[in-house]
C-alpha cells in the first residue's frame, strides 16, 4: 500500500507558523532572547548549554519516534486536513491572525487613546452632573434641615412650656396641700407655750421674714407635728395622772364616809344627821364635777345611801378604765412596769366588785372597807410610779387618742343608770 503524500504547504503546523501574528511574535521573542544573551555573558553560556541539550533531546526523540510517525502517517494526514479546515474558519472569524504584532499594538494604542478620551469626556460630564446633583441635594437638604430645626425648636419650646406649666401646677398643688396640712396641725395640735412666746416676740419685733420654700415648709411641718404631738401626749399623761389621783382621792373619801356612816348608824341623831349632810354634800359636788347642777332632790337616808354607793361605783369604774388603758400602753415596757400595771387592774376590779351589787351600807362590811382603803393607797403609789415612768423613760409615740377616754360621757351615762336605779327603789 502506497503511503499518502502530505503537501508541506498544507501542513497545519507550517500554516500556523506562517501566520503574521505568530511569526511577528516569534521574531519579537527571538530578538529579545538574542539581545538578552548579548547583554549578559553568564546568561548566554547557560542559554547555549540549554539549547544544545534541547537539540540533543529533540534529535533523539525524532529518531525514536520516526517509525511510529511513519506507521501513523495516514491518520496524521486526515487530522492535518481537518485541522487546516478549522484554521481556515478561524482566519475568517479572527482577522487579527493575519496582522503583525506592530499593527495590533498600534490599533490597541489608538483604541486605548480613544477610550481614554471617551472616559475623560464621560467623567467630566459625570462630574458636572454629580456636582449639579449634589448641589441640588445639598440645597434641598439644607432647606429640609432648616425646616426640621425650626419644627423641632417649636416642638421643644412647646414641650418646655408644657413641663413648666405642669411644674407650676404641681407646685401650686403642693403649696395648697402644705397649707391645709398646717391648718389641720394647728387645729388638732394647738400651739405650745414656747411657740406662743416665740410668736409674741415675732409680732413685737415686726421682723420681715422671707417666705420659705416648700421643702423648708415640709421639714418645719414634720418637726412641728412631732413636737406638738409629743407635748400633747405628755399633757394627756399628766392629765390622766391628775385625774386618776383625784379619782382615788374621791373614792378614798367616799369609802371613809361610808365607814363613818356605818360606825355611827346607831349613835345620836345629830351624828347621823352630820354624816348624812357630808354624804349629801359629796353627792352634790360629784354631780357638779361631771356637769350636773340639779339640787332639787330628796334628802332622806335611803337616797343618800344609794347615791353614795352610786358615786363609789362610778369612781371605781373610772379607776378600772384608767388601769386597763395603762395596761394596754404598758406592752413592750420592762416586766416590772407591766406587772405593776396588771396588779393595778386586779386591785381596781376587786374594789369595783365591792360596790357593784351593794344596795345599802349594811351590805358593805367594815373589813371590806378597810381593805379597800389599803388597796386605794397602794394603787395611788403604783399608778404614780407607772405614770412617772411613762413621762420620763419612754417615747410617747404609743399615745394615740385620748389617754383618759371620754370620762365626762361615761360619768353622765353612769349617772343616768344610777338615778333610774334610785327611782326604782
UniProtKB/Swiss-Prot annotation:
- For whether the record's keyword set contains Membrane, the answer is yes
**Which locations, inside or outside the cell, does it occupy?**
Membrane; Lipid droplet
**Which residues does this entry mark as bearing N-acetylalanine?**
2
Keywords carried by this UniProt record:
Acetylation, Lipid droplet, Membrane, Phosphoprotein, Ubl conjugation
UniProt GO BP:
cellular response to glucose starvation; lipid droplet disassembly; lipid storage; long-chain fatty acid transport
Modification after translation (UniProt): Acylated; primarily with C14, C16 and C18 fatty acids. Phosphorylation at Tyr-230 by isoform 1 of CHKA (CHKalpha2) promotes dissociation from lipid droplets: dissociation is followed by recruitment of autophagosome machinery to lipid droplets and subsequent lipid droplet lipolysis.
InterPro entries on file: Perilipin
Report the GO terms under cellular component: cytoplasm; cytosol; lipid droplet; nucleus; plasma membrane
Q: Which residues carry this modification: Phosphotyrosine?
A: 230
- Residues modified as Phosphoserine are 213
Q: How does it sit in the membrane?
A: Peripheral membrane protein
Q: Does the keyword Phosphoprotein apply?
A: yes
Q: What induces it?
A: By dexamethasone.
Q: In which tissues is it expressed?
A: Adipose tissue specific. Expressed abundantly and preferentially in fat pads.
PANTHER family in the cross-refs: PERILIPIN, PERILIPIN-2
- Describe the protein's quaternary organization and the partners it interacts with: Interacts with IRGC.
Provide the family line: Belongs to the perilipin family.
Job of this protein: Structural component of lipid droplets, which is required for the formation and maintenance of lipid storage droplets.
Tell me what this protein is called. Perilipin-2
Look up and give the organism this protein is from: Mus musculus (Mouse)
